[in-house]
Amino acid sequence: MPEQPKKVADRYLKQEVLGQGTYGVVFKATDTKTEQTVAIKKIRLGKQREGVNITALREIKMLKELKHPHIILLIDAFPHKENLHLVFEFMETDLEAVIRDSNIFLSPADIKSYLLMTFKGLAYCHDKWVLHRDMKPNNLLIGVDGQLKLADFGLARIFGSPNRKFTHQVFARWYRAPELLFGAKQYGAAVDVWAVACIFAELLLRRPFLQGNSDIDQLSKIFAAFGTPKADQWPDLTKLPDYVEYQFVPAPSLRSLFPAVSDDALDLLSKMFTYDPKARISIKQALEHRYFTSAPAPTDPAKLPKPVPKQDGKSSYGKHEAITVQSPPRKLRRVMPERGRVDSLKSHVDKDQQAPMSLDFTILAERPPNRPTITSADRSHLKRKLDLEFQ
């Protein structure tokens, strides 16, 4: 006999589980008042019922203020049985599932459509002085109508205040800008732009672009793709807290990494992957780039291809040939700094990994990747009274 739906706080009829994470579970439900299908994120509150972890508190605060067609709608929030429930509009899938599905052919017009929706949502955030700080394909949700929406604002912050410092341990590593990997604590919207550039590349390649297995290795992947930055490219590089000098590696042509893309797409990618965050194109400027006005026109979201649900949950990554960048000779790969600087940099490598003394410059791995999560971000809990009033 199938499991009977369970009611949550009387109004919502819980159905199947959609996913699980560190803090709780997301499940599909029906709003018995409106008959609307919704997604409910259940988050453990902890010992004090009035308390809430800081990530959930920030997400509620941000989403109550951000209202846009390409940002997920938070419908309701309520505590129930020592859990906090966040009620969102139901979204059918996410961009990661689209990229992974080898049965889906993504045309240049399809890719442009997904990027246009992503850029519009992020531009709205930046107009409101909000950094997302966790841009990645599985945080870009797609509805039954094909509309893409930014989700997961737990790491979002208000920016723009002079001298305000943030943690540099944000974003999943593969989407982390080089200034963050070098320990920058004062940064702005450019970090989101770099992450979206990585998503752009992932849509083109149908696999993650820069797959580092530590912060040091992530930098090696970036330098292999774009060359070691020079002083005239990034004047403030040596001032960053965790700066370490690397042996110069020449950049391959961007065309060699993306051989099939249009000149306009390649030009936009190069501007988004600019090393110096002060010179990196803004998301608003990116929306005005000729890539979005040149042919082909973006696909109507309602006509975008959708992934077929996989019963075994296996990834289709790893079925394509890897694109690699030739490494320089091992002894020239990195200039070894003083011992103290090495120890400083090692402190940013995951505890269960050793800082590699030689670096692998492969851009795309052959094996199915283990997608990293933000394990090093501040996960402390704050006990606060929670405003759950919705207009």
From Swiss-Prot:
Domain Protein kinase: 12-292
Protein's cellular compartments: Nucleus
Post-translational modification: Phosphorylated by CDKF-1 at Ser-161 and Thr-167. Phosphorylated at Tyr-23 by WEE1. Autophosphorylated.
Catalytic activity: L-seryl-[protein] + ATP = O-phospho-L-seryl-[protein] + ADP + H(+); L-threonyl-[protein] + ATP = O-phospho-L-threonyl-[protein] + ADP + H(+); [DNA-directed RNA polymerase] + ATP = phospho-[DNA-directed RNA polymerase] + ADP + H(+)
Regions of compositional bias (Basic and acidic residues) in chain numbering: 309-321, 337-353
Residues the record lists as Phosphotyrosine modifications: Y23
Chain positions recorded as ATP binding sites: L18, G19, Q20, G21, T22, Y23, G24, V25, V26, K41
Keywords: ATP-binding, Cell cycle, Cell division, Kinase, Nucleotide-binding, Nucleus, Phosphoprotein, Serine/threonine-protein kinase, Transferase
Molecular function GO terms recorded: ATP binding; cyclin-dependent protein serine/threonine kinase activity; protein kinase activity; protein serine kinase activity; RNA polymerase II CTD heptapeptide repeat kinase activity
Record flagged with keyword Transport: no
GO-annotated cellular components: nucleus; transcription factor TFIIK complex
Keyword Phosphoprotein carried by entry: yes
E.C. code: 2.7.11.22, 2.7.11.23
GO biological process, one term: regulation of cell cycle
Tissues of expression: Expressed in roots, shoots and suspension cell culture.
Region (Disordered): 294-321, 337-391
InterPro entries in the record: CDK, CDK7, Kinase-like_dom_sf, Prot_kinase_dom, Protein_kinase_ATP_BS, Ser/Thr_kinase_AS
Pfam families, A to Z: Pkinase
Activity regulation annotation text: Activated by phosphorylation by CDKF-1.
PANTHER family, sorted: CELL DIVISION PROTEIN KINASE (PTHR24056), CYCLIN-DEPENDENT KINASE D-3 (PTHR24056:SF553)
Function per UniProt: May form a stable complex with cyclin CYCH1-1 that phosphorylates human CDK2 and the C-terminal domain (CTD) of the large subunit of RNA polymerase II.
Recorded family membership: Belongs to the protein kinase superfamily. CMGC Ser/Thr protein kinase family. CDC2/CDKX subfamily.
Assembly with partners or alone: Interacts with CYCH1-1. Binding to CYCH1-1 activates CDK kinase.
Protein name: Cyclin-dependent kinase D-3
Taxonomic source organism: Arabidopsis thaliana
